[in-house]
Amino acid sequence: RVEEAGLDIPKLDEVTQIDEKWALVIECQAGETLETVMEKDPDNLEKYMAEFVDLQLQIHAKTAPMLTKLKDKLAKQINQLKELDATQRYELLVRLESMPKHTKVCHGDFNPSNVIVGEDGKLTVVDWAHVTQGNASADAALTYLQFALKNRVAAEMYLTMFCKKS
């Protein structure tokens, strides 16, 4: 479904089950993850972050009407949270419903470990298992949180660049 958006993504070879869990088998992408490149060359973090943000914005510029809606996916996840009582789940669902209805492609797990830097420097995004259509700000918020868990400086750099460029 995401292929319909016209993004340059690895070819899906197979959908299969491994240890009774669903798995996507994609064509092999030669290179290193952007995360590895950033760790090896921290002096150029700003340059790599700019390329990373530009890549995410290219994704957000696309639409794919056949993708699952982000709000539907989040509503399902909220409803499955048994750690919360019904009132708490209801309050979250009301807040979710107030989110703007957008149809932008959202990767759902966009972080430097899911970007392969090819030998020619070309960036390729992998791990499209969580892709949806919805509010790009929610996708960016998830990316920010993933950065913040590992590196607060990188998280702030990401957020600043994303806000300036979007």
Which residues make up each language-model segment?
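Conserved protein-kinase catalytic-loop position immediately C-terminal to the HRD catalytic Asp
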Residues: S113-N114
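An alpha-helical support segment within catalytic cores of ATP-dependent transferases
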Residues: A61-G108, G118-E119, T124
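Activation of the activation-loop gatekeeper triad in protein kinase-fold domains
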Residues: D127-V131
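An acidic site on a long C-lobe helix of protein kinase domains
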Residues: Y48, A136-D139
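Active-site activation/catalytic loop segments of kinase-like enzymes and analogous catalytic loops
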Residues: A140-S166
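Alpha-helical elements of Rossmann-like donor-binding domains used by nucleotide-donor carbohydrate transfer enzymes
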Residues: E51-Q58, E91, L142, M161
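ATP-binding pocket architecture of kinase catalytic cores
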Residues: R1-K69, E83, P100
